[in-house]
Amino acid sequence: MGITKKPDLNDPVLRAKLAKGMGHNYYGEPAWPNDLLYIFPVVILGTIACNVGLAVLEPSMIGEPADPFATPLEILPEWYFFPVFQILRTVPNKLLGVLLMVSVPTGLLTVPFLENVNKFQNPFRRPVATTVFLIGTAVALWLGIGATLPIDKSLTLGLFQID
């Protein structure tokens, strides 16, 4: 903090401006042209130079080269598609699976209308929204973890047996 420019609060002109409600726009260095023409390009070019330097000095393979003749037994999607993949994998009727996926954003869109005390920011004063968030997070985690398991253990996560 010793490097940054601090305003002189003993300056009577600055005190008068602050008393009138004129704040940070009336003291310090202007953003144009100092920041936008000199500091920002240096930071951006420095970041690009660091990335290019690391890519040139330490090139690493992302993974094994693809072998088109050896496919895995089960192809999994990216991790953020695991809950959706699990719904489609476990629901026997594909139309029902698609309708379940469409019902999630539709249900989330109805939450503000179910709970008309929107003026509060405290989550404890919005019990419906908080409950929907917590249950939705738990279900998404459950489905996401289940998508990585075999189909017979996917719904129970292997924690208990269903006959």
Curated annotation (Swiss-Prot):
Subcellular location: Plastid, Chloroplast thylakoid membrane
GO MF annotation list: electron transporter, transferring electrons within cytochrome b6/f complex of photosystem II activity; electron transporter, transferring electrons within the cyclic electron transport pathway of photosynthesis activity; oxidoreductase activity
Disulfide bridge map: none
GO cellular component terms attached to this protein's record: chloroplast thylakoid membrane
Domain of life (superkingdom): Eukaryota
Location, primary (coarse class): plastid
The keyword Phosphoprotein is assigned to this record: no
Record keywords: Chloroplast, Electron transport, Membrane, Photosynthesis, Plastid, Thylakoid, Transmembrane, Transmembrane helix, Transport
GO biological process: photosynthetic electron transport chain
Family: Belongs to the cytochrome b family. PetD subfamily.
HAMAP family tied to this protein: Cytb6_f_subIV
NCBIfam families: cytb6_f_IV
Name recorded for this polypeptide: Cytochrome b6-f complex subunit 4
Annotated organism of origin: Drimys granadensis
Gene from which this protein is expressed: petD
